[in-house]
Structure formats: C-alpha cells, structure tokens
Amino acid sequence: EQQRFYVLTIFIPATAAVAYFTMATGFGLTEISVNGQVLDIYWARYADWLITTPLLLIDLALLAQANRNTIYTLVGLDVLMIVTGLVGALAATPAIRIVWWGISTALLVFLLYFLVQSLNEAASRQTESVRSLTTTLRNMLIVLWLAYPVVWILGTEGTIGLIPLYVETAAFMVLDLTAKVGFGGVLL
C-alpha cells in the first residue's frame, strides 16, 4: 500500500535539497531595499515551497483517498499562500509586507481548515490504520505549518526583525526538514 507513495514522496526532500544547495552556494538569493536597509531574500526557498508543499498535500490527500476537487482546492490554496508570501517578502515597504503576510497567513488558516474538514470526511471511509496515519500526518503538517508565518514575521522577511537572517534560515531549515523528511519517514 505504501509503495505507491515512494516516487511522489522522494521528490519532496530531493527538491528541498536542491533548493538548500542553491541557497548555500549563493544562488536563489536577491537583495531588496526596505526603508534604506538591504535585506537578503532567499527566493529559492519559495520555489522549493511552491513544489514541495503541494506534493505534501497530494500525498496526504491520496492517503485519505480524497477526490480530485479536494486535491485541486488544497493545491490551489497552497499555491496562492506561497505566492502571496513571496510577494510579501519582495515588497519594498513595511506596510505592504504586512498586508501580504496577512493575506498569506489567512490563506494558510483557510487551507488548514479545509484540510481538516475534507480529509476527515475522506479518511472516515478508510481503514482504521489509514485514518490514524492520515490524522497523524495532518496534525504534523498543521503544527509545523503554523510556525512558518511566525518565523517569517519575526525574521528579516517580516517587519519586526527580532531574529537575524542566520537564525531565520536555521528555523526554516528545521521546519522544512521536519515537515518534509519527517513526513516522508512517517508515511513510508
């Protein structure tokens, strides 16, 4: 049963590894000026998320045997969330950055609500082991994904800037490793 997830799941950490390699070697980075301060924005992180987060959702939806409309809705909300987060990171004024962060975070909340509602319904028709695994993976994603906008707003990409770039990058890396490699380890 779990073998059908191997191919899809292996692309999640593989894509993240490529993105982190590009960031580590100085690519996937752009500088923007916000209030006279130059900020390093790792756009490769968003490229990674644009690929890997839909794959995580597809994996989870396939496990629960959700229908196509559910999968399309989850992926559509996810793509909008990532793109609006990137727009916020690239915005040159603090107020606009906060607005885009708010839009992206609202999309995240709506996505997570839809994820719970739709996957509970789909998984309810599956075996107890599938329901349990779906619930575990879903809850794992919810907890981890709720941390991303907090790191964003407190870090250099947000306007608060309480945590420096290296701490922000490390926090995103830990979240990504847990959400991607951890997810795959639990699923497979």
At which residue positions do the language-model features occur?
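Polytopic alpha-helical membrane-helix bundles and their juxtamembrane interface segments
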Residues: 1-44, 53-188
